[in-house]
């Protein structure tokens, strides 16, 4: 269970396609400005490993340390925690529900990305139920939903912000806007923090999310 080790943040949603890995990469990049960051890629697709490998080739890049020596992501997490100020975990999809629950027990905070559509919202209820299960072992575990790929002027986005509050899990004030720069960063193998003026608005957005999540 998380205690006085690194602040451990997991990005989790049992539904795929919610932007989980994109948020994980940019959050971990933002945290490198605040301390030592470890990264655990628990998603079998291994997208974070490719990102770290690519990013480490950039001369000015501050790249989190990836823990992937063990096939068991929980073991990788326990190895990372004593050596860093922050650890970010990209959780697996619904194929590995047992592993996700074990990871949650070791975390301080679960961030749940949700796309602004009713189907995605309903699919997230299973993740929320898993968090409640993890809290039986780790009662201090906190969680919040973050709307991803939002369009502020969209009626759907406004309706979702109202509906999502009924799930009983806090919703971050900051949402992740639908921005081409997030896709561009992936293509270039970097984070939005490395894109200069092009990525400034997105980087500010990620920092605002971190300000809401990380204890002051």
Curated annotation (Swiss-Prot):
Belongs to the ParA family. McdA subfamily. It comes from Halothiobacillus neapolitanus (strain ATCC 23641 / c2) (Thiobacillus neapolitanus). It is found in: Cytoplasm, Nucleoid. This is Maintenance of carboxysome distribution protein A. Self-associates, associates with McdB. Its main location: cytoplasm. GO terms for cellular component: cytoplasm; nucleoid. The keyword Metal-binding applies. The gene is mcdA. The keyword Nucleotide-binding applies.
């Amino acid at each position: 269970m998380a205690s006085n080790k690194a602040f451990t943040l997991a990005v989790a949603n049992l539904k795929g396609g919610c932007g989980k890995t994109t948020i994980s990469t940019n959050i971990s990049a933002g945290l490198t400005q605040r301390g030592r960051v470890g990264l655990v890629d628990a998603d079998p697709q291994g997208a974070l490993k490719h990102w770290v490998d690519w990013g480490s080739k950039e001369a000015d890049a501050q790249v989190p340390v990836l823990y992937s020596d063990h096939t068991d992501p929980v073991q990788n997490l326990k190895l990372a925690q004593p050596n860093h100020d922050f650890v970010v975990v990209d959780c697996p999809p619904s194929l590995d529900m047992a592993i996700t629950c074990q990871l949650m027990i070791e975390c301080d905070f679960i961030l749940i990305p949700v796309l602004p559509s009713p189907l995605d919202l309903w699919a997230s209820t299973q993740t929320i139920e898993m968090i409640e299960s993890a809290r039986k072992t780790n009662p201090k575990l906190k969680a919040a939903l973050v709307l991803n790929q939002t369009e502020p002027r969209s009626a759907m986005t406004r309706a979702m912000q109202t509906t999502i509050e009924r799930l009983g899990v806090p919703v971050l004030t900051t949402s992740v806007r639908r921005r081409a720069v997030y896709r561009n960063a992936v293509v270039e193998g970097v984070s939005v923090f490395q894109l200069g003026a092009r990525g400034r608005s997105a980087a500010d957005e990620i920092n605002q999310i971190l300000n809401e999540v990380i204890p002051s």
